[in-house]
Amino acid sequence: MTPTLSSSADVLPSLSNMSSETNLLPIQQIAPQLGLSADDLIPYGHHMAKVDISALRPSGPQGKLILVSSITPTPLGEGKTVTTIGLSQGINRLGYRGVACIRQPSLGPVFGVKGGAAGGGAAQVLPMEKLNLHLTGDIHAISAAHNLAAAALDARLYHEQRLGAVFSQQTGMPLLNIDAQQILWPRVVDHNDRALRHIQVGVGGGTHGVERHDHVEITAASELMAILALSESLHDMRQRIGRIILAHSTSGQAITADDLGVAGAMTALMKETIHPTLMQTSEQTPVLIHAGPFANIAHGNSSVLADRLGLQLADYVVTEAGFGSDMGMEKFFNIKYRQSGITPSCVVLVATLRSLKANSGVFDIKPGQPLPAEILNTNIPLLSQGCANLKWHINNAKSYGLPVVVAVNCFPDDSPEELAFLADYALSAGAIACEISEAFAKGGAGTTALAQRVIDACAHASPPVLAYPDNASLEQKIEILAQRYGAREVTFTPQARQQLDSITAAGFGHLPLCIAKTPLSISADASLKNVPHDFVLPVTACAVSAGAGFVRIYAGDIMTMPGLGTQPAYYHIDIDDEGCIRGLS
C-alpha cells in the first residue's frame, strides 16, 4: 500500500460547511438510482422520503452485502460511519449501483458527547441536521407506542386494584392480577437523562395510581426499536409486538401486550415506521436509514427491511454494525442473520493509527483532553502494541467464515511509515486486504481503491458460521461467547441465575443472546484495554425480549439510560434568524 495523502491545509477548510454548501437533489431524483419510481416514495419534504415496503419483491436478483465493523472503539472515534458512507460512494464511482444502510441517530448522543451520526466531511448523509434531529419521526413514534403500553399497564393495575372482582363484571375482561413488583416495561425518552434512572410513579396514591418504583430508559433500548429493526413486514411487526412480555401476574404468569389489549394500538402508532427512509450522501448517492438500536444495550444494526430493499435494488449494500466486532457484528450474525438469513459477503474492519495506539492501553485517553505526543507522532512500537487489538477483531470476524478487509481511516498527517507497517500487520493477521480510506477528505474519490478491494473480497464469500447452535442452553451460549472474548470464567448473580432458569422454563432457551456490556473493552470491564485475557465475565441480570426474539444478558453494571457529561454537545448548537442550525455535528 503506497498512500498518497492530501495535506490538511488543502482539504479541511473546504469541508467545514459541506452540509450547507452541497447542492442537494430533490429526493425524487435520487430514487431512480435504485430503480425506484415516484409511486414507491412517501415524501417528507424535498430531500427525504420513505420507501414504501410494497416496493419489495418476493424474488429476483440480489446484490451483495458488505458489513462494516471496527476495532474496539476509543474516545478518538474510528470513523465507521464516514467509512460506510464513503465506501458506498466509492462503489458508485466504480460504476456499480451501491447504497449505504445506516441507523437513525438517537437524540441522546446527538446532544451528549458523541454528537450526530451522519458521517462527516465529504462522506456524510444530507441534510445532516434532518437526519440527526428528527428524520421522519420514527423514534418519536416508537417512544409514543412504548409509553402507551406503560400507561396501559399502570391504568390496568390501578383499576383492577380499585374495583377488584367488579372490574371483570363492568368490563367483560379477565383480571390480569398484575404484580406491581414485576412490571418489566419502563417508560422511555429519547434523551440522556440520568435523573430518570430511578423514579417513583403513582405518587400520592388514590386517583393518582398505584405507587411503585420504576425507571426510564432511552428509546434506543426499547424492545420496540429492536422489533422494528428485525421485522419482515407490518404483519410480522404486529405479531412481535403482541408477544412482548410487559409484566408478570401475582401467580407468576407472563402478561403480554396482547393480553393487555394494547398491541394493536401500539402497532397503529408505529405504522409508518415500517418504511425505510431514503436520503442522499454528499455525492448525491442513495442512503437508506431505518431503526436505531444501540449496540451495547441492544443489537446495534439497521433494519432487515432496509437491507432487503437495498439488496433488491443495488449491486452492493454497505451496512454498518455498531461499535466493535464483539458488539454489533457479533449480534448481526447471531441475531439478525439467524432470524432473517441475510448473509454478508465481506466484513470491513475500520481502524485509525491513533485509535490503535490508544488501544495499546498505555494511555488513559479521555474526550476533550489533549492527546499525548506519542499518539500523534510516529511511534511504531506503540502502534505494534495496539495492533494486537486489530488482530483479535480480524480473527473474531474470520471466525464467522467471511473474508475481512481492513479499512484504515486516514488523517492528512498520518505517517506513511506507520501506514505501511499497519498494512503488513493486517495481512499477516489474516485480513484478505488492507487499504486506506480518505472518505472524510475526498469522499468516493478517496475510497475507490478500498471499494475495489472489498468488491474483490466479496467473491470469496461463504455461508456464515454461527458462534453457537440454537439448541445449546442459554448458559452454554454465554460461556461460548465469553470464551471468545477471552474470559476465564462466567459468574452469575443469584438474581441472574434465577432469571436464566425462569427464561429457560418458559420455553425461551432456544433464543439467541444479546449481550449488553461496555463497548470500550472486549471484556465487560472498560478499564481492561487491548486484548484482555483470563478475566471474569460477570452476568448481573437476564431478561427475555420475546417479541424481538432474543435473550438480553447484562454483563457488568449496564445503564440503559445514559447521562450527560460536563461538556455536552448542546452547548455548541444554535440557530440563526434564517433557521440555519449551527454547531450540530
Swiss-Prot record:
It is an enzyme of class 6 (ligase). The keyword Isomerase does not apply. GO terms for biological process: tetrahydrofolate interconversion. It catalyses: (6S)-5,6,7,8-tetrahydrofolate + formate + ATP = (6R)-10-formyltetrahydrofolate + ADP + phosphate. Its EC number is 6.3.4.3. It holds the Pfam family FTHFS. The keyword Nucleotide-binding applies. Keywords: ATP-binding, Ligase, Nucleotide-binding, One-carbon metabolism. ATP binds at residues 74-81. Pathway: One-carbon metabolism; tetrahydrofolate interconversion. Belongs to the formate--tetrahydrofolate ligase family. This is Formate--tetrahydrofolate ligase. It comes from Yersinia enterocolitica serotype O:8 / biotype 1B (strain NCTC 13174 / 8081). The gene is fhs.
